[in-house]
A protein has these predicted regions:
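Ubiquitin-like/PB1-type beta-grasp interaction modules and other compact soluble beta-rich domains
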Residues: 1-169
Length: 169
């Protein structure tokens, strides 16, 4: 038997209007109190509601800025904001950051420095790196190696001090 855990999810902006649940007045988030299977990530939750990770600006879990790969725990409060609301959070202090080393090979150097150390919110996915460097539309033209292993899933959850190498195919 799979254990279910209760969580609270708030959808803001146009995300709240896409849900089939109760509609709120403008400016008020749509809050859902639901039960989910243990060990799901925020990304799993987004998929269940038909929301793509690239539609999201910011995710907060219990008030802490987080990535889509953050594992949801019993009683978590999750706030999900759309891209259009991104400017509201320009000066967030990133609590619980992870650091990754990214190396761009060959002609991909045009998308950033040859090598960079990047801080990301805990639970960030490979997709967040691709979006950050404008590579999400080139996913099928690049090879991504994380810690020496090829990774083909954009929703791969990054860990602290992962080494990411990006090659052109």
């Amino acid at each position: 038997m799979v254990n279910k855990i209760p969580i609270s999810v708030k959808f803001y902006g146009e995300l709240r209007d896409r849900l089939p649940y109760k509609k709120m007045k403008a400016g008020i988030p749509n809050t859902l109190k639901i039960e989910i299977n243990e060990f799901k990530t925020v990304l799993d939750l987004l998929k269940e509601f038909g929301i793509a990770e690239n539609e999201i600006s910011h995710i907060f879990v219990n008030g802490v800025y987080s990535g889509a790969g953050k594992i949801i725990k019993d009683g978590d409060r999750i706030g999900i904001f759309p891209k259009r609301m991104g400017l509201m959070f320009m000066e967030i202090t990133k609590i619980n950051s992870i650091y990754t080393k990214i190396t761009f090979h060959e002609e991909l150097k045009e998308f950033g420095l040859k090598e960079a150390i990047v801080d990301l919110p805990e639970g960030s996915t490979l997709n967040s790196i691709l979006n950050k460097y404008g590579l999400s539309n080139k996913r099928h033209q690049i090879e991504i190696i994380v810690n020496g292993k090829p990774i083909h899933e954009s929703d791969y959850i990054l860990k602290d001090w992962d080494n990411i190498a990006i090659f052109s195919l």
